[in-house]
């Protein structure tokens, strides 16, 4: 099947393009499918931890205004679908960002989705990046119908457009 990393990157590149066209500077934590772990990380677990720590470091040292982390869900149950944003309850601006993106994804995708932006405290990036941060789960690869959509260029464009409009709303609200 398709890797989550590959699809996330396609959506991120589309979002980067939209943001740069409107005059924003964009910093990606990676520009290919390779994780950004330290070379001394040996085991898969060490590599994952190192990768996440390096993303947090980029977020905190970048002088960026916001941090948006794009993901796809994959769980054993196949019935779940839809997108959802997450934020740190201790960061009000992170919450505003997550809500703005959630609402704009709802408009861009135009599909029934009752999920709302949700606070989450056990995700390292959300806890440790100091600027307003949101995780955007764009959908479920474990749902066959949604996986098909997530691989379509047009659907990825709509996801990027929803995230983009959420970011714009965040800065102008």
Please state what every model-predicted region is.
Residues 2-173:
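Active-site-proximal helix/loop segments of hydrolytic enzymes
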